């Protein structure tokens, strides 16, 4: 089946995007929060 062949690639790509996006958004949120607290 073609689904079994494309499924792992799609999953790895999804994990890679979220693995990079989640820490980036979290770090941006923490940096902005620290700046708000300092002011």
From Swiss-Prot:
Entry note: cofactor: With its partner (PsbE) binds heme. PSII binds additional chlorophylls, carotenoids and specific lipids.
UniProt xrefs under SUPFAM superfamilies: Cytochrome b559 subunits
One Gene Ontology molecular-function label: iron ion binding
A GO CC term assigned to this protein in UniProt: photosystem II reaction center
Subcellular location: Plastid, Chloroplast thylakoid membrane
GO BP terms: photosynthetic electron transport chain
Family label: Belongs to the PsbE/PsbF family.
Record's subunit section: Heterodimer of an alpha subunit and a beta subunit. PSII is composed of 1 copy each of membrane proteins PsbA, PsbB, PsbC, PsbD, PsbE, PsbF, PsbH, PsbI, PsbJ, PsbK, PsbL, PsbM, PsbT, PsbX, PsbY, PsbZ, Psb30/Ycf12, at least 3 peripheral proteins of the oxygen-evolving complex and a large number of cofactors. It forms dimeric complexes.
Protein name: Cytochrome b559 subunit beta
Species this chain originates from: Huperzia lucidula
Gene for this chain: psbF
